[in-house]
Regions:
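Strongly charged
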Residues: 1-131
Length: 131
């Protein structure tokens, strides 16, 4: 008997990630659209990293308009971490633009959990999800 979560995860739409853009590629992209050089932009990004670390180590969140908020966290072992909360405007722009990447199981976008489980049960009759 398959679990409901296994079936849903098997068929859920997933982005097939391309190569991650690094600082150099970001700097080249931004420099082509501004009067700054790639070196200037990398310097600013390095300074931004230092500034976020500084304020987070002081227990302060950092809000970067258009990107999101970086909030320091701590767990029971005393390990520090940073949570990123995506800016609402950026999320809205992502969802209102046309996505050019590849999506695995794209045909399942908009299907209900019941429809996905029915699909699983039809394709896996020997390992059904039971309600």
């Amino acid at each position: 008997m398959a679990s409901r979560i296994s079936a849903l995860n098997h068929y859920r739409p997933q982005i097939e990630y391309g190569e991650t853009a690094d600082w150099r590629e970001m700097a080249d992209y931004m420099a082509a659209r501004s009067t700054l050089s790639p070196s200037d932009i990398i310097g600013v990004l390095t300074g931004l990293e230092d500034a976020v670390l500084h304020f987070n180590l002081s227990g302060r969140g950092v809000k970067l308009e258009g990107l999101g908020t970086y909030l320091p966290n701590i767990n029971y072992r005393g390990e520090l971490d940073v949570a990123h909360r995506l800016d609402r405007r950026l999320k809205r722009q992502l969802n209102n633009s046309s996505f050019n990447g590849r999506i695995r199981n794209k045909k399942n976008i908009g299907k209900s959990a019941a429809e996905v489980i029915a699909l699983w049960n039809a394709e896996h009759p020997d390992d059904p999800v039971l309600y």
